[in-house]
Amino acid sequence: MIRICPSILNADRDNLPSEIARISGESDLLHLDVMDNIFVPNFTFTFEESKKVIKECPIPVDSHLMIADPDERAYLYAKAGSASVTFHYEASLNPMQTISRIKDEGARVGLALKPATPFQEIASLMEHLDMLLIMTVEPGFGGQSFMLDMMDKVKQARKDIDSRFFGKIWLQVDGGVSLETIAQAAESGADTFVAGSAVFNSDNPGSMVDALRALALKSSAR
């Protein structure tokens, strides 16, 4: 199954409800990028702002936490109603405890890897995850170029997911996903795609979601 998750990082912040309405009918989840200006050099949403988006969004929210203290705060985003909460392995001192706290609140749990973090470093945690997020840009800003060299990591993760977990763990890519790059990611084994600039900078965001899905389906064996 292919999933398209538009990121509101590049949406019009002053008109978020209408921006979300433009893609909600075509999208599987809304990707909420939470940045604290500590773990990454950018700030996006406060927790209160995030709660408002989660509460009012007509489709499930996938909260991606680029924050320095996920061990203390990640579960709060699950408690606020996120369907899925993803935190960064690099920011966590106790990933197993954080995974458990998110699951205890009833949300799916994802683990994100920055480009420099090898897949093998988190292989032992895979059995506890619902999703693995492989960053295809350096986290912090939208509109960056897709890192094609991350496809080896995606292929490695896909092989592990299929061989050990029968394909049940979602494999997400985030960063630079567009009509020009989604095919490579799908061919490499990704099944869940975050797209920000490509969607919200287009004339018709909903149609762009459909176009991205069609390309991913055509390029994927999943």
Give short role names for the model-derived ranges:
Residues 43-63, 101-110, 150-171, 212-221:
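Alpha-helix-loop-beta-strand connector modules within alpha/beta enzyme cores
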Residues 29, 36-44, 48, 115, ...:
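Glycine/Thr-rich beta-alpha phosphate-binding loop at enzyme active sites
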